[in-house]
């Protein structure tokens, strides 16, 4: 049996500039952090001659081509696993569609398990690149590369997306004090809304391809805020980082009609009035999680609890996609 896991993530600045429709022309940049909430994959050789795939539904098929789950099917093809004696199960700490990059985490965990099954050693950058081939190239999803790369490499990381497709990354240089304070003061609250990121990202993708000047200006500004966020983090100026998150969100929610709604805006304003310096909706927008940097955590938690929002406490993950068990 093989068990792998990949971390989910939160974006810290520059998100949205990792879509090919933007970075192929202008280059992209963002900062993201992996968190200790995971997608797990278990892979087990079975006695029965069939492929058993367990996720939100159950598939039992004879060949790879019959698999309905598109990522599973394409991952098996890419790695070259055609063995019909396999059972594959996925589990997650947080539901999909909540803005934490679960599809990228799922794909990297799955690929890691399949490579382990074939006794291949794969570097995190290669793992992320393969996940992008599956999701962006083979399946044509209108998404970016952030989720696959931060899941694979973990940590708090700055990514540069070059027009020629190269991705460079390096860990954010945080002092021990800054790391402690960032982890301690960032709070996540679930809005109760789930959504498919592809719906909102398709609008951004289409408008970027059409050189829509408003969309491009939004993304240029977002990239600038990403660079400024990195500078603030590395300088240990976390209050400035919080204000930049607020600037990012105020800017981001005008990017698309589905980015926010009156209820999310009400919760956000309530947070700023109760101990939060800044925050944002994590992911493409429209629901999922609100993340805030708080100077009064107790007050913010109380206010959000009274609004009916559930907090998910987290720590950062510095391991990325990994094998948990192999025997």
What name fits each language-model region?
Residues 1-11, 18-21, 36-82, 91, ...:
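C-terminal nucleotide
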Residues 85-87:
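Residues at or immediately flanking beta-strands
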Residues 104-118, 287-293:
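Short, small-residue alpha-helix embedded
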């Amino acid at each position: 049996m093989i068990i792998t896991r990949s971390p989910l993530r939160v974006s810290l600045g520059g998100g949205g500039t990792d879509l090919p429709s933007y970075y192929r022309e202008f280059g992209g940049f963002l900062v993201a952090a992996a968190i200790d909430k995971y997608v797990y994959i278990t892979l087990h050789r079975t006695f029965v001659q069939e492929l058993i795939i367990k996720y939100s539904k159950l598939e039992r098929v004879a060949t790879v081509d019959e698999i309905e789950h598109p990522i599973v099917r394409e991952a098996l093809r890419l790695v070259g696993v055609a063995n019909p004696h396999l059972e594959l199960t996925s589990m997650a700490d947080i539901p999909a569609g909540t803005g934490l990059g679960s599809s990228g985490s799922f794909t990297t965990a799955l690929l890691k398990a399949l490579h382990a099954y074939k006794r291949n050693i794969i570097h995190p950058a290669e793992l992320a690149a393969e996940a992008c081939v599956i999701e962006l190239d083979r399946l044509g999803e209108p998404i970016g590369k952030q989720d696959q790369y931060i899941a694979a490499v973990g940590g708090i990381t700055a990514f540069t997306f070059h027009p020629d497709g190269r991705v460079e990354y390096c860990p954010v240089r945080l002092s021990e004090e800054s790391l402690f304070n960032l982890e301690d003061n960032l709070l996540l609250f679930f809005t109760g809304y789930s959504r498919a990121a592809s719906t909102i990202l398709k609008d951004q993708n289409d408008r970027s391809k059409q050189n829509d000047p408003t969309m491009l200006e939004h993304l240029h500004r977002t990239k600038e805020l990403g660079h400024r966020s990195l500078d603030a983090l590395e300088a240990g100026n976390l209050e400035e980082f919080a204000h930049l998150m607020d600037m990012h969100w105020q800017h981001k929610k005008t990017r698309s009609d589905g980015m926010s709604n009156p209820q999310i805006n009400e919760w956000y304003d309530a947070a700023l009035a109760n101990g939060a310096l800044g925050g944002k909706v994590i992911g493409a927008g429209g629901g999922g999680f609100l993340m805030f940097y708080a100077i009064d955590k107790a007050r913010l938690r109380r206010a959000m609890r009274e609004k009916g929002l559930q907090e998910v406490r987290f720590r950062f993950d510095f391991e990325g996609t990994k094998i948990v068990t192999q025997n």
